[in-house]
Amino acid sequence: MITIGINGFGRIGRALTRINLRHKKYRIVAVNDIDEDIHNHAYLLKYDTTYGKLRDDKVEVEGDQIKVNGQTIKVFREREIKEVPWDEMGVDVVIEASGVLQNVRQAHKIINGSVKKVIVTHAPNEGIDFSYMYGVNSDQYDKTSHHVISSSICDANALGPFFTLIDREFGVEAGEVTTLHPWLSYQNLLDGTLKSVSSPGHLWRDYALGRSSIGSLIPKETTLCNAMQKVLPDSIEKLHASSFRTPTSIVSSIDGVFLLEKSTTIDEVNKALRDYTQQYPGVLKLDDRSLISIDYLGNENAAVVDLRWLHVNKGKMLKFVLWYDNEWGYSSRVYHIVSRLI
């Protein structure tokens, strides 16, 4: 069984731990977080406002360990990823979920002994051997030379498979997409200056992002195209993206239009989608039910294609809507690629 260590025990780190309680594919033996309150970490693992309480799993603290159903997870409190004794813990794969660039820069230094791979849960501009997305560019992955791997971002994981399929089957000449993304912890509850927006490593320019996150749709720049380029280099010349932060807590959506090179029909698009879901199970899901965003809470797919809004206009303009759980769905993508990288 593959052994995992998690650096950064925030939303993604805890989601990965909960997902493993469901699937039981790996052993999580170590987590590292700069917050020294181990009881608080255990509390947040057990009680989650978004995903609910762990009702059938026993979570307790014993010294420097969190015990989940009797299985121990040792908790470290190091500020840098290189200071954690991953090798001593027998870790095969370290998941870098802190979001701190310095940890990405140090990732190659911990590839030794038992540690074979580091997965970075965002899309940094440096320190990465390969940006991996199953069903998109996974056939280009080289196990012998790619050791520090980016799992990209939630938005790119949602759009990437759909874009790849449509571009392969019909050709995408140009695309306009808008992401609708729930608020994040660095945003303000009440109006404030940009300096009050707590997001280390980011320099925001638009005053609108300092406004209250719970009362309005907030237009915002997005890193989607930059992240897509790292996985699909040619996509940068075809796609333009914008974003809204929405006054909701979970589940994102992408509303988009592709101008196609090849004329097609809705039946041909639907068939291509069905074939893709069979070739790459678990990546895209097709759904024609009358659902709303919260109904996709806890969905593990990279994205759900809402067939109600899939439309071909005059043969070459494809309208689409995708849904994705920006926390659980993305964490599930990270979780399931671990075994594909070893």
Task: Show the residue positions of the predicted features.
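N-terminal Rossmann-like NAD(P) cofactor-binding subdomain of oxidoreductases
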Residues: M1-G210, H336
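Conserved active-site and cofactor/substrate-binding residues in soluble primary-metabolism enzymes
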Residues: N7, R11, M89, R105, ...
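Acidic-histidine catalytic/liganding microenvironments
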Residues: H23-K25, E169, L232, Y280, ...
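Glycine-rich beta-alpha junction loops
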Residues: I34-E36, P124-N125, I153-D155, T179-Q187, ...
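Small/polar-rich, solvent-exposed N-terminal microdomains that initiate assembly or binding
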Residues: R205, R211-K220, K285
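Short acidic (Asp/Glu) and glycine-rich catalytic loops that position anionic groups and cofactors
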Residues: R205-L209, S249-I254
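A structural supersecondary motif
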Residues: K230-F244
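C-terminal active-site/capping subdomain that shapes the small-molecule cofactor and substrate pocket
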Residues: H240-T246, S253-I342
